Amino acid sequence: DCNRSKKSLVQPRRDFLKTLSIGTIGAASMGFTFTSIESSEKKQRLRTRDEKLKQMASNSYAVNQLFKRRAYSQRPERPEIQQLKEKYGEFTLLDFPAFTRDTYPGVKKMDLWSSLFGDVTDDSMYTHIKTDTQVRIGEFDPSAPSSKRYLDRLVSNMVSTGVTAAHISNNAPRNLADLNDELRKEGIRVAKIWLDAAKQIGAISMRVNTGGPQIIPASVIEDGYPRNEEIVPYLRNAIESFKELADYAGKAGVKITIENHWGLVANPVNIIIILNEVNNPYCEASPDFCNWEHEYMLYHGLEILIPKATSMVHAKRWTRFPDVDIARCVRILNDYKYKGYISVEYEAGGDPVEGTKKLLEDVVNALI
């Protein structure tokens, strides 16, 4: 692919982005074997603040209230969002590299949410969903010619600011575990064109969901013992989908990741099952500190997933678990010598920018 694209005007920029991304991630192990934990503090040299900040990534979802949205006359903007935009301004994803540089000094990487891609004034960049009565605008379509030009503009802005994409948190591909094979294959198709987009902007990893929040079959009691046959076909389909995507991801040079995010993969054991069955270095975990069903999963779930992660972790403070011990979560990363990127995802109410800054400080202070 590289040889065929040398004539592209943006290829030098993409090489620049890829070189930056590999620098931090290269030292991380790609194996999936659980290892014993040694005392990190005894073995590792304490890093400077600037060195720690190079491991951090801004999170566009955390400040999505500040982004320009499609105008809907029947849905006026809430007063609290208007106040935030008066304070920080309104912007698009094209502005996010500069926002990251200016708002979080020292942070050079970004975690970009899929629903914020595109120019909301240009419908040609989006899918069109036809109903009996109307055509509704859907998700950003990275394969559209106008979208490819948009992504090149994003690359230019990243190069000019020195702030580049590490990861795409993607909600666009759906139904990867669905029992309807037509829907599942469509989800795979969408994920592949997004992997191409991730490659275009120089991201090294991309999260894809297994399915919607409703897919979480529960056990039933049979002969006095819990049994859950209902979940098996969903797991089987997820495994097949991620096998195909991992092969495609390897060719693109972008890792496909599974986050504890909704439904089937809200349980870390299901993520481990999928990853072990796929058994491909281009398919790994991207754990989130807080996306758990209950409080006892907060730290134990992270310990289960972190050996399978080399590219991205979401450091989250969330209203569901407002008292999450961020330092304890980071100690788990330290113990496993995690060297991938850490995206700061604040979702605990109030001012999202100030909340992100505080969370960033908490994570950096706990890193070694």
Residue ranges and their predicted role:
Residues A177-L183, V220-Y234, I258-N260:
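Surface-exposed cleft-lining segments at the edges of enzyme active sites
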